[in-house]
């Protein structure tokens, strides 16, 4: 789960001697918003497509645009979630990875981050989703786990989020069974507010609904 484990080796890097035109060409070819600028393995910063497009002279070299570079980067030995934070903060489709000496290791793409997040969240595991709402003091992971296990289920992934304006605490559970109606009923019996659930019952209902819509369309 470290950033160095998810570096994309195919991402190009720019030099200070590269022109605006060449940089834009690479950005378009690789469909990214930024590219790293490197000098003798040292990371100098990210240059954005927006800043490049603002230049009237495509023959201008990147040496003259250093004041626009995003100099932030993430370290190679930290958790990948820091890369997600970087991407959101800078609205960048590339996250540069460096060591303590700012030596450039490579970049993580947002498309790769999405796949990593999917694995991290258990998105590829078959199961059901239950979303609970509660006051923060009501949250007890031990009690939630007990109710899940009492219904012969296991938690694949658990995520929490707080609405800072209301103080409401949201808990999203991904469990290993699709038939979750008994588990939902168990939460409701224990006075949990079940905001949303998605299991085999809803999946089958959606299939039936889509089939009926298709039949109506074919009858037109």
Put a short name on every predicted segment:
Residues 1-26, 37-39, 43-48, 57-88, ...:
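Bateman/CBS regulatory modules and CBS-like beta-alpha motifs in cytosolic regions of diverse proteins
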Residues 28-31:
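N-terminal, positively charged regions that mediate nucleic acid binding
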Residues 33, 93, 154:
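Short acidic/polar active-site loop segments enriched in Thr and Asp
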Residues 47, 108-109, 175:
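A conserved hydrophobic position in a structured secondary element of the catalytic/binding core
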Residues 52, 101, 105-120:
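Short, structured interface segments
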Residues 85-88, 115-118, 146-149:
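A broadly conserved amphipathic alpha-helix scaffold signal in soluble, globular proteins
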Residues 127-220:
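A conserved regulatory-domain signal marking ACT and ACT-like small-molecule sensing domains
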